[in-house]
Amino acid sequence: MNGPSSAAPFKRLEGKVAIITGGASGIGAMAVELFHENGAKVVIADVQDKLGEDLADKLGQDVCYIHCDISNEDEVINLVDTAVSKFGKLDIMYNNAGILDRSFGSILDTPKSDLERLINVNTIGGFLGAKHAARVMVPQQKGCILFTASACTEIAGLGSPAYTISKYGILGLVKCLAAELGQYGIRVNCVSPYGLATGMSMKGGVDPALIESSMSQMGNLKGEFLKTDGIANAALYLASDESSYVSGQNLVVDGGFSVVNPTVMRAYGLIK
C-alpha cells in the first residue's frame, strides 16, 4: 500500500516573473493569486492603490504593487523597468486591465468621447504594455505576452459597438505580434471571456448572483457558472510551458456560446 506522497505540488510558473495589469480586482486579482500559487513572482499594476497594496501585502515578498495608468506610456515604461529592476527579468506580461462603457447603448446614442475612452484604455493600453514588454523580452529571446479580450469579438450582440471595437483591436494586435515576435521566442495570445460577475460589471450595486444567473440563462453550457478563476486558469495555461508552442491564438471561454445557433435544433425539439 502506498503511503502519502512527500512530493511538493507542481508549480507551473516556478521561477517566472509576471506583470498583471488590472491586477487589483476581478479577473486580474484572481490571476495574481493563481500565478503566485504556481511559483511566479508577480507585479500587480493598477490604479486602485488600496486594493493593489492590500493584495500584495497579503501574498508576501514575491508580490509587489505599482500604480500604473496603462494609457500613459511613461507609467507603462516605469512599470516594466521597475519589475525588471526588482526581479531581474520579465517572463510574462498579462495585459488584463480594461474598462466598460458607461452604459450598453446603441451606436446612435454613443458619444465619440466614449469610443475614445475605451480605445485609449482597452486597445492603446494593451499596445503599450506589449510594446514595452517586448522591449525587454527580445534580448532575452523568450517571453509570453497575454491579453484579456472578450467573447464579443466572436459573435455580435455581446458588447456595445464601442466596447467591441476596442476588443477587436486586441485580436489584431495578437496576430500581428505573434508574427513579428515569434522569431525572438516570444509567444502572444489572448483569453476572451463570456460575461461574468466582476467588480467592473457590478458597478451600481448589482448583485453578482443576479449577473451569474442571467448569463447562465442566456448561455449555452448549463450547470456551470463562469467565474474569475475560469479566466485566470485559462491565462495560467497560456502563460505556462504547457502551451510552449501556442501563439497567435484567442482562447474563447464562453461555454460554446459563440459557435452555437440553437434556432433549428429548437424548431425540431432537440433542445429546450
UniProtKB/Swiss-Prot annotation:
The active site is at S150 (proton donor), Y163 (proton acceptor), K167 (proton donor/acceptor). Keywords: Oxidoreductase. Pathway: Secondary metabolite biosynthesis; terpenoid biosynthesis. Its EC number is 1.1.1.-. Signal peptide: none annotated. It catalyses: 21-O-acetyl-isomeliandiol + A = (21S)-21-acetoxyl-apo-melianone + AH2. Expressed in maturing fruits and in juice vesicles. Pfam families: adh_short_C2. It is an enzyme of class 1 (oxidoreductase). The keyword rRNA-binding does not apply. GO terms for molecular function: oxidoreductase activity. InterPro entries: NAD(P)-bd_dom_sf (IPR036291), Sc_DH/Rdtase_CS (IPR020904), SDR_fam (IPR002347). Belongs to the short-chain dehydrogenases/reductases (SDR) family. Oxidoreductase involved in the biosynthesis of limonoids triterpene natural products such as limonin, a compound with insecticidal activity responsible for the bitter taste in citrus. Catalyzes the oxidation of 21-O-acetyl-isomeliandiol to (21S)-21-acetoxyl-apo-melianone. This is (21S)-21-acetoxyl-apo-melianone synthase SDR. It comes from Citrus sinensis. The lineage of its organism: Eukaryota, Viridiplantae, Streptophyta, Embryophyta, Tracheophyta.
